[in-house]
Amino acid sequence: MLDWLTRPVPFADEEFAQPSLDRDHFAQAVARALRDVSRPERLRGNPLLTAGFVERMAGPGASEGQRIQVLRRMLERAICELGLRPQYRRWQAVAESAYLHPVESQERMAERLGIPFSSYRRHLKSATEWITDFLWQLEIGQPDSALLVSEPLQTVS
């Protein structure tokens, strides 16, 4: 009877109504941006630079360089958010090694983390999907949903 209370309220602002990319293209752009996040010059031209969440955070009239900085910060934040849930800390470690500090082959990074390469690849895929979901919630104007996806630490009184 009161189930309408649990439905999300749509934003009145038209800026949130239509994402600049459909979900599949958004996911492809996130995967590409994650691969390039440690090399900002390679983020030039990434479709996420025109995504609503980047434009809102960068502000009106932001340069491409400013939008790149915002995108990098959001990718780094999403990776950090993974570590807030104990069951995803392995995903965070893998994402950090693959995307933020890619200094050697994935095989070597898996070895350094003490996990089989197949597990490393599986964790990397899961982390990438989670990060995509987190950013998608921001893109469609559901920042509260992004916080629910990340389940941030809560203080205990």
How would you label these PLM feature ranges?
Residues 1-86, 106-107, 114-119, 123-126, ...:
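N-terminal interaction/assembly modules
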Residues 83-105:
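Short amphipathic alpha helix immediately N-terminal
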